[in-house]
A protein has these predicted regions:
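Feature captures C-terminal
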Residues: 27, 31-211
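Glycine-rich phosphate/diphosphate-binding loops and the adjacent beta-loop-alpha structural elements
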Residues: 8-28
Length: 211
């Protein structure tokens, strides 16, 4: 009964049209969640969310706890980690060429191109390319921190801190409630003409070998 009542509590936000998700390609909801991760993490340069952790679109209408659980059913924890730009580029290049869920980024534009038969990622902030040795503070979740980001962290994870960190649902609930109303077609989350992570083709990206 307690759990049922908790899931029925209103989330404080209302959607005007569904905020759509996607697994293979960039979509509004993972981008929005990456934005909120960054906003919820003091000092974060980047927000990074995995589309595989977003299970349904955010439907139109009032957001209740049950819907929030359905969108993010996993108890992933919100973490702040540090990686160099070169490491983040490597993670994004590998993801672009893979078949797992795409990664959603906030705070940077990640331009993915083919160069000499290899996948190249250029990270830009306000139009300027970041040098490889730039250290970035990334707001993400423990799934990514223990997975593709792990080998690129500037310092090892503190497992006690991971266990004490809030779940994504708890961390983002307040952020979502403060927004009041969401438009499913809001170009801040996804603009097909100006994606956050433009690619030379659909995932998995395959770069032809140089002649």
């Amino acid at each position: 009964e307690v759990a049922r009542a908790a899931r029925a509590r209103p989330g404080g936000v209302r959607g005007r049209g569904a905020v759509r998700t996607g697994y293979r390609e960039e979509a509004a909801l993972p981008n929005l969640l990456a934005d909120l991760l960054r906003a919820a993490t003091p000092g974060a340069d980047v927000g990074l969310m995995n589309a595989g952790g977003v299970r349904i679109e955010l439907p139109a209408g009032a957001l209740d706890e049950g819907t929030l659980y359905a969108v993010m059913p996993f108890d992933n924890r919100l973490l702040r980690v540090r990686v160099r730009a070169a490491g983040l580029r490597a993670v994004l290049a590998r993801n672009a060429g893979g078949r797992s869920g795409t990664l959603a980024i906030s705070g940077l534009r990640a331009e993915i191109t083919c160069e000499g038969g290899a996948t190249r990622v250029t990270l830009r902030r306000d139009g300027a390319a970041l040098p490889d040795d730039q250290v970035l503070t990334v707001a993400t979740n423990d799934y990514l921190a223990r997975g593709p980001l792990a080998e690129h962290l500037t310092e090892a994870l503190d497992e006690e801190a991971v266990d004490a960190a809030p779940t994504l649902r708890d961390a983002l609930r307040t952020q979502l409630a403060a927004m009041g109303e969401l438009r499913g077609d809001d170009p801040r989350w996804f603009d097909p003409a100006h994606p956050r992570m433009p690619m030379p083709g659909p995932r998995p990206v395959r770069c032809p070998s140089a002649p």
